[in-house]
Curated annotation (Swiss-Prot):
Keyword annotations of the record: Aminotransferase, Pyridoxal phosphate, Transferase, Virulence
UniProt-recorded Gene Ontology molecular function terms: carbon-sulfur lyase activity; pyridoxal phosphate binding; transaminase activity
Organism, scientific name: Aspergillus fumigatus (strain ATCC MYA-4609 / CBS 101355 / FGSC A1100 / Af293) (Neosartorya fumigata)
Entry EC no(s): 2.6.1.-
Necessary cofactors: pyridoxal 5'-phosphate
Protein name: Probable aminotransferase gliI
Family, per entry: Belongs to the class-I pyridoxal-phosphate-dependent aminotransferase family.
Induction: Expression is also regulated by rsmA.
Length: 435
């Protein structure tokens, strides 16, 4: 008998993944393990209409639950009724130019899971995807852990929401992408466009989308459009344009290279139900591979309730309208707070967060720009004050001091979180009044 227990060794890829993840997400892991209560303004969840959704889901379960919903889902790619309801939803709400058919769709356990599977299918290990900075840090987890894909950074112009000179904006965008492609350390297979943008909250003008589609065609790349915040718009003047609504053939673009991601996590405030949609309208082999990878990954309970909701356009429209109204109120509240304290921020046109330079006064040298170390220390001070926000370095921001602040939380928590931020970065004892 051996005198001591020997722990079996994990595979090299598992050990490599653990090392990468703990280094990349050490702060988030520490926060999850912490016992001190913090106002969570880091996680991009949508609490704006949770009570309304719970009531709606209870009713739908009571009306539609049957013994068959305790079985595996039928069909490849997802439950047939859900695929039909989703196709109708995309055609109606996203104004699809080429009608979305159930055979174009695959359901999975959220957008991240589908993106991970997609990258595994289109990229060889070590190949790259062009992605604009700053970007949500969770994208890298989908890139790295299974597929070993490299995120190749693109630094486009900061255009906010709209531009007075659209021609110049389009030109600057394409120049930034061409430069990143030329300088890439690996072969590039795709571009990933997050529209509306995470974390900046801007919406891409149609002409920028069209130019990026043509860029992808010119360089034989896949065009991946993550549209998870598509219906969480905040600015009535800035309309969202889905890639599904664009006549790509008229641009000389092959529809087979276009892939769209969507989920119920944000617009329907249901991140815990784990349901996302992948749409490929002219690449049946890709659709089949994704269907195989995601077979029976979505709970039939989730399929049941979302199928019933999407089958009722009036109910779905009402929920989405309530969501937008609630998000607009919260966005105004946090924008007023930032403006009161003269903190630079990007006015969000969509999403559940704001991109703000909370660290603009954190430099130890008056008048100088803050450093990355100072950003990290400021983040520690936020944590100590009982509020969690997303520091810009985790989003590959180009300059220190930026933070992503989620505002789609209950109003009492939102005000409490802003008070704690105020304690850390407030100026000369000024106290903002919530209206």
């Amino acid at each position: 008998m051996p005198s001591e227990t020997i722990t079996p060794l994990l595979a090299h890829r598992a050990r490599t993944n653990i090392q990468w993840f703990t280094h990349k997400h050490m702060r988030q892991v520490s926060r999850l393990n912490a016992k001190q209560h913090r106002v969570n303004m880091m996680t991009a969840e949508n609490w704006s209409i949770r009570d309304e959704l719970v009531d709606q889901y209870k009713t739908l379960f009571a009306q539609h639950l049957s013994p068959r919903h305790l079985s595996y889902a039928d069909g490849m790619g997802g439950d047939a009724e859900l695929l039909q309801a989703a196709a109708d939803f995309f055609n109606r709400v996203f104004a699809a130019h080429s009608r979305v058919q159930p055979a174009h769709l695959v359901v999975g356990a959220g957008c991240s899971s589908l993106l991970e599977n997609l990258l595994y299918d289109i990229c060889e290990p070590g190949e790259g995807v062009l992605i604009e900075t700053p970007f949500w840090g969770g994208f890298e987890t989908s890139f790295v852990l299974r597929s070993n894909v490299t995120a190749v950074h693109v630094r486009p112009p900061c255009h906010g929401n709209g531009s007075a000179d659209l021609d110049r904006l389009v030109s600057a965008y394409i120049e930034a992408y061409e430069r990143a492609l030329r300088q890439a350390p690996c072969r590039i297979k795709a571009i990933l466009v997050c529209n509306p943008h995470n974390p900046c909250g801007h919406i891409y003008p149609p002409r920028v989308i069209q130019a990026l589609l043509q860029f992808a065609q010119r360089h034989d790349l896949f065009y991946i459009s993550d549209e998870i915040y598509a219906l969480s718009t905040l600015d009535e003047q800035t309309a969202f344009t889905s890639v599904l609504s664009i006549d790509v053939a008229a641009l000389g673009v092959d529809l087979a290279r276009v892939f769209t991601l969507y989920s119920i996590s944000k617009d329907l405030g249901s991140s815990g139900l784990r349901l996302g949609f992948g749409i490929t309208q002219a690449h049946p082999d890709l659709r089949l591979s994704l269907a195989i990878s995601n077979h029976s990954r979505v709970s039939t309970f989730t399929s049941l309730v979302i199928t019933a909701l999407l089958h009722d356009p009036e109910a779905a429209t009402a929920i989405l309208h309530q969501n937008r109204a609630a998000l607009q109120r919260s966005a105004k509240l946090i924008s007023d707070f930032l403006a009161f304290h003269q903190i630079p921020f990007v006015p969000p046109a969509a999403g559940v967060y704001v991109w703000a330079r909370l660290g603009w006064r954190s430099s130890s040298r008056p008048g100088d720009e803050p450093s990355w170390d100072e950003e990290a220390r400021l983040n520690d001070r936020f944590e100590a004050a009982g509020v969690s926000v997303g520091a810009g370095q985790g989003y590959c921001a180009s300059e220190p001091g930026w933070f992503r602040i989620t505002f789609a939380i209950p109003r009492e928590e939102l005000v409490a979180g802003l008070r704690r931020i105020e304690q850390v970065v407030g100026m000369e004892g000024q106290k903002w009044t919530a209206i």
